[in-house]
Each structure stands twice: as structure tokens, then as C-alpha cells.
Amino acid sequence: MAQATISITVNGEAKEVEATTTGVELFAEDKNIIAVKINGENRDLYTPLADGDTVEPITLDSEDGLAIMRHSATHVMAQAVQEVYPNAKLGVGPVIKDGFYYDFQVDKPFTPEDLKDIEKRIQRIIKSSQSFRRRSVTEEEALKEEADQPFKIELIEDKEAHLDPAAATEISEKELSFYDNVDRDGNVVWKDLCRGPHLPNTRYIKAFKIERSAAAYWRGSEKNPTMQRIYGTAWATKDDLKAYQTRLEEAAKRDHRKLGAEMDLFSFPDEIGPGLAVFHPKGAAVINAMEDYSREMHRKHHYSFVQTPHITKGGLYETSGHLHWYKDGMYPAMHLDEEYDADGNVTKPGFDYYLKPMNCPMHNLIFKSRQRSYRELPLRLFEFGTVYRYEKSGEVHGLTRVRGLTQDDSHIYCTREQMKDELTSLLTFVLNLLKDFGLSDFYLELSTKDPDKYVGSDEIWEEATRTLREVAEASHLDLVADPGGAAFYGPKISVQARDAIGRTWQVSTIQLDFNLPERFQLEYIAKDGTHQRPVMIHRALFGSIERFFAVLLEHYAGAFPAWLAPVQVLGVPVADEFAPHLAGFVKSLEDEMVRCEIDYSDDRFGKKIRNASKSKVPFILIVGEEDMNNNAVSFRFRDGSQLNGVPVDKAREQILAVIAKRVQVNSADDFNAAVAE
């Protein structure tokens, strides 16, 4: 009797295969294939194929393959933890960038020795070649199997758990399933609630490393129990793992928190609170240079500068929608202005005031403060506006995630006819300014509507999204989709920049908004005399001053280009008798607004040079007897190269030229090339 067959499409080609075929048989000859994409959905190799299926292989070294392998690694890690702590309660184990984590409720935090023991057990499990086998279950069956796992029970009973990105690794909207870890004898040695997919077996986990552990709240809420989270990473090859660890080592050297302390740039005093940075004189010098250049460029592009208060009545954020959509990210209300009589009775009701989380509502009030004409549009309002956002204490991170931040915030009001041209010129302005700060490798991300969290009509959102996409595509930069990633009031383009070691940072955002003008009843008088709504564009070029400062600090590893450097010139006299000559030259630079210091310490000259090199100053100026006699100075650069005996007038001219050109100079060759242009 002939074997029944089915028709499938594999990599675009039609094939007839036996009806019982799975991905295991289909791709048996290629051991690098670890899963399949069936009709666009990632599935295990063991998944039976059906007539009409479209099948694509997933290789271990692909993006999908790495994600599947890392998720399988979380199961192995959880199995190892429960070998050590049989009573550990399991949370969730999602894949994150370059790795994964798993949350556990245990009696005490994991120690470094615990993690070493767990990692050894992981290696034994991997070598045992356990297979991952999926089985579907009913809710009743799942609850019975997880009777001693309260966090899993919560996920099973939560009908919207699949909407939680971390929980979605466990729970599917369609059905519940478990994955069994099966040993070579066919025995189930461990299991976990999971939607999958997974590797065929543990031997495909080629390069694995536990990285660290930390406390975390269950499902990210401070109201929930504290879990112990173990982070790990896994890669397709040991060489890939080694390269990743090298990148981590380089990133650690560039960590802005470390450099900020070493270079005396900023701090986070406990007396002030988490996420609230204090910039020291040298850090503030960099901030001022960033802001001054930004102001200069905004003036050239016809922006109007405004200034708004840090606190406002809550009604403003009711109008804007922030209190409905964003209240959890705002500081609590302060009830003020209430008046009482002698008996304590309220004679005048007060108001709830809020620290502002965003500047846009106040800018809308400026637009609305008088009648506007089409002749005034586009109106570009700009402010370095400080805002306050309540980030959980466990989520603040250096300058990249803070509670108080200053945005280079602009809101542009234009007609619909002006919208596309304005967005095009705005994106060009943004990219050019970022290049002036030394970032040049970009791609764009288009964030579109979250169907569960938006205001305004679908038609308006579609128009806004289409226009942003056209502008982004016209830039000829790579465009990546971010479905559902937009704020509640409009779609946005974000500029993603790669730094000196290849990491990606979100910097600028450009957000189109048809909704806030409606909520604030903003109008202008059109050419035909009718009242029309303006289009509103939100734009933050740096994102925030604090975050962009951190990005630049890590990008340059503290060695800022001269125009941004906290100290641009450091003078080091060979001996005390040469200090007056050096001081006179430094004074002439300070008169030109160059940021200078002189080392007058009692240290030996060699130590002064070592200290100067550690400070990452772009220009170390040395004066000895020959320099003094010839009215000259000598340059020492970051790489140790020197230019000796440069006449002071020429040296001053060259230093000012390099600063004005905003170029990076780390060596004598760089310097000569810069001044020769």
C-alpha cells in the first residue's frame, strides 16, 4: 500500500513528502538546523507537517535560532537550580538582548559559589543530551501539574498573561503546553510550562555562561514578591561567546558611571535620591558645550526659544491625556492652595499639582496664548526643559535611565501641506547635528500604533504613519519596524546610532501628533479665513541631555574631542621657574574661552605627565627652558606623540582652529591634519 503524502513548500520550492514527516526528517542532513518556521511561526523540529504548509529552516546562528537556543538554555538553568534548591519556585525565563534570565523565589540570594555550582550542573545537563519534547495540556491539567508553583498558577489563570512580554514565553494565547526534558532512557527528568519552541536536545547549547544574579520584583511590580534573577548568555560557538565577553570587557572600560567618577564629572548623592544626577564643574562644562552648540544650530534653523515651569496643575495633564495613560510614570500629586477657616473647614478648595513628565502640554498653551495665522507656520518652539519621571528605584541606571532629565525638546506646529517637507528637513537637521557630535552610523526605527493604547482615529494614525514612513525611506537609511511601540498620541521615528564599539543607542525621536492639537483645541486661521487644526511634531534630538552625555562619554571612552572636553588644555611646567611663561600663554587661551588648567602640584614632572595622560585632556602643553627662551610651547597628545617648540602665536591659532572644527584629535598626526585643512 502506497504511503500517504502531503504537498509542502520548502524555501520556496514545492515538495511531496510522507504525511508523517516532521522537520527532523526534512532537514536530517543539516545539523545546523535546529527549528523550523511553519507558515511564518517558529516551531520545533518535531512538529508534524500538514498539507499546504510553507516551511523554512531556522539555523542555530540565525537571530531566531539564537533566541530559541537561549530559551532552551533558560530551561536547563532552571533545571540546575532546582537540583540545588528543590523547593525553588519558578517565575519566568525570557530571552533578552544577547542572553536571557530566569526568576526564582528562593530562601536567600544566590552567592557566587552557588552560581559556580549551578553552572557546573548546567554543563552536565548539556552533555547528557536531554531532548525537549512539547505536549499540550488543558488548563485543569496545567493547574494540577503546577500545584506547588504559585507563580506558574498565576500565569495560567491570568487570561491576559500572553500580553506581558516576559510571561509570553510561558503562555500562548492559543493553548497551554509543557516542555519535558527527556533523558536518553526516555525518562522525563524535568518540565516547565512553556509555549516554545525549543532545540531538539541540549547538545545544541554549544557555548553557555552564567553572568550574574540580582533581585527583581515578580512581573516588574514593587507590589509583588521579590525574586532572585539569574542572568546568562549563550552563543552558537565558543568563539562567538569569547567575542561577546571581549565586547563586555570593552564596554565595562567605557561604562559612563565608572568614567564619570574617575573624571570627576557627576555623581548621585544618596542625600538627593536615586536617578537624580549632580553634575560637577567638569561635567557641567561638557553639558554647557553641548547646549551652547545646540542653541546655536536651533537659532540658525529658526526655532523660537521658550521656557516653562517644572510644576503644573493636574488639569493640564487631564487635557493632554497623560494622567490617563501615563500616571504610573509620574510623581504623585501635591495638593496645594487649599484655604481653611479658624475651625479647620475648607473655605477654598485646592488643586493637585504635578511635577511635569513632559513639556508638550505647556508648549501647547504657548501656541494657544493668542490667535495664530497660517503665515506664522511652521512655528518651531524649543526648550531645554527639565522633566521628572517616576522610574522604579531598581530600574534607574546611571545617566541612561534617570528620574530627573533635561530634554532638548521641540514642538513644531505646521499645516498638513507643510508636514512632509517639515519632517524631511527636520530629519536632515537631526542627522547633521548628531554627526557634529561624532556619531555617523545610523538606522531608523518606525514605531506604530499599540492597538490597546492610543487616542485618535485609525484614519489619522494611518496618515501619520504613512507620512513618517515616506520621510524615513527617503533618507536612504535602513528602516526597522517597531509594531506597537508608539506613544498613545502618535507614531514616531527614532534615530538609532551605533557607537565606537558597535552598540546601538536610541538618540533622537521625531513624533507626529494629530491628537494633542485636538485635545487642546489648537487652531490657526487658514488662508481662506477658516479655523484649522495644526499638525504637531514632537522632537528631542539628544533624547535627554543626561542620556546623550552618557552615550558620548562611552562612545569616546572619556576622550572627548577638544570642543567638548571638560578641560581642553592642561599645562605642565617642567619646573617651577617655567610656570609664569606657561601661565601667560594659558591666560591668552582663557581669554578666548578655552577651558584650561595648570598643574602646580609638587609632584615630579614624570608623575604630572602620567596624571595628565589619565585625565584624557586633548592638549597637554609642556614648557621647559628651551620653550621659554624661544617663546614657544610643546604639545603632548593622548597617544604620547609630541610636537615640540611650537611658537605661542601659532600654537594658540592651531588650538582654536581644532576646537572650532569640532574634530577628534588624539595624536600629532591628527593635529597636523586638522590644522592643515
Curated annotation (Swiss-Prot):
GO CC field: cytoplasm
Region (Catalytic): 255-561
Keyword Membrane found: no
Superkingdom of origin: Bacteria
Binding residues for Zn(2+): 360, 411, 538
GO molecular function: ATP binding; metal ion binding; threonine-tRNA ligase activity; tRNA binding
Cofactor(s) annotated in UniProt: Zn(2+)
CDD domains: TGS_ThrRS, ThrRS_anticodon, ThrRS_core
GO process terms (BP): threonyl-tRNA aminoacylation
Annotated catalysed reactions: tRNA(Thr) + L-threonine + ATP = L-threonyl-tRNA(Thr) + AMP + diphosphate + H(+)
Subcellular location: Cytoplasm
Residue span(s) of domain TGS: 1-59
Alphabetic keyword roster: Aminoacyl-tRNA synthetase, ATP-binding, Cytoplasm, Ligase, Metal-binding, Nucleotide-binding, Protein biosynthesis, RNA-binding, tRNA-binding, Zinc
Cofactor binding description: Binds 1 zinc ion per subunit.
E.C. no: 6.1.1.3
Top EC class, one word: ligase
Pfam family, one: HGTP_anticodon
Chief site of localization: cytoplasm
Summary of subunit composition and partner proteins: Homodimer.
Function: Catalyzes the attachment of threonine to tRNA(Thr) in a two-step reaction: L-threonine is first activated by ATP to form Thr-AMP and then transferred to the acceptor end of tRNA(Thr). Also edits incorrectly charged L-seryl-tRNA(Thr).
Record-linked HAMAP family: Thr_tRNA_synth
PANTHER family associated with the record: THREONINE--TRNA LIGASE, CHLOROPLASTIC_MITOCHONDRIAL 2, THREONINE-TRNA LIGASE
Protein family: Belongs to the class-II aminoacyl-tRNA synthetase family.
Name of the molecule in the record: Threonine--tRNA ligase
